[in-house]
Amino acid sequence: MQKSKEEMRKMEQYAEAVASALAGNQEGYDFLYQSTYQKKFFIAKKYMGNDMDAQDVLQDAYVQAFTKLNTLQDYQKFPNWFGMIVANTAKNALQKKKRRKWFMKC
């Protein structure tokens, strides 16, 4: 399936933003944050069940992603790569929460 011009343009914007962020430009980080926050918040909330925990997960996920941005091989795939980080961060948070509840019962 061929990608639309809009999809291609968006992918190019992500590639440019990642390159910009890696070069130390705040604008690159701002674009990556602003263009992914809504959708990734929805993912985090689906896992966590409430806004506060979802925001915590998302904050942790952004820190991880921006710290490891240099490991991303295909800059155009930032949204998918970041989505995986959000999901994994949420799963880890749920496991910690579950362990904490179990520990409190003992």
Per-segment meaning from a language model:
Residues 3-5, 22-31, 41-60:
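Short, charged helix-capping/linker segments at alpha-helix termini
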Residues 14-17, 28-29, 57, 78, ...:
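Hydrophobic side chains within well-formed alpha-helices
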Residues 22-23, 62-77, 96-98:
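Sigma70-family region 2
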Residues 32-36, 40, 86:
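Hydrophobic/aromatic residues within well-ordered alpha-helical segments
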Residues 70-73, 87-105:
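Arg/Lys-rich amphipathic alpha helix in sigma70-family domain 2
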